[in-house]
Regions:
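Nucleotide-activated chemistry modules centered on ATP-dependent adenylation/adenylyltransferase
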Residues: 1-174
Length: 174
């Protein structure tokens, strides 16, 4: 079997301006990029939890355009949906046995179970030296300070602010 000589490079992609600008910068500057990984939160088994206009943009504009540029897009989904979580019961802690109902801002089990968990499960299938590009702008210092290990912001590397990211996406038709 052939040994892999270079680490994989993936973009965590929400299809917002910062993650799309990260992809565009990688392409523009010849940065290694193996795939864009998007984790779609589903409302139920058939309906996306994304705002319909954003979902349409993702599937009908962004993914096809990225694939034409040579960027593979991978879509992850959790086994559980928003409805599963909303109607489920708490399994641990002082509220054990109670219905979950509406998620509490800042303690959002939907983010944890429908976005972070499937992404982490996927990450475990990747080599440990995989580099993860994160779309955090040059002017978002508090967020940049939270980057760890193999996480890299190309927006920071190339001194792109959120406004610069927006303009880059607009120029690219994204």
């Amino acid at each position: 079997s052939k040994e892999r000589s270079k680490p994989l490079h993936i973009v965590s992609c929400s299809f917002g301006k910062d993650s799309l600008a990260t992809i565009l910068l990688a392409l523009e500057h010849g940065e290694p990029l193996d795939e864009a990984v998007y984790c779609e939160v589903m409302f139920d088994k058939t309906i996306s939890g994304e705002v319909p206009e954003h979902r349409d943009f993702i599937y009908h504009t962004a993914i096809p355009k990225l694939e034409r540029m040579g960027v593979k897009a991978r879509v992850l989904r959790a086994e559980k949906t928003y409805v599963d979580l909303f109607t489920g019961t708490v399994t641990r802690g002082p509220k054990k046995g109670m219905l979950r109902a509406f998620p509490i801002c800042g303690k959002c089990y939907v983010q944890r179970d429908c976005k972070i968990r499937p992404f982490r499960q996927y990450q475990r299938t990747l080599p440990p030296d995989t580099v993860q590009y994160i779309g955090i702008a040059h002017d978002e210092w508090e967020r940049l300070l939270r980057l760890t290990g193999q996480q890299v912001s190309l927006l920071e590397k190339y001194h792109f602010t959120e406004e610069d990211a927006k303009q880059l996406c607009r120029k690219a038709g994204l």
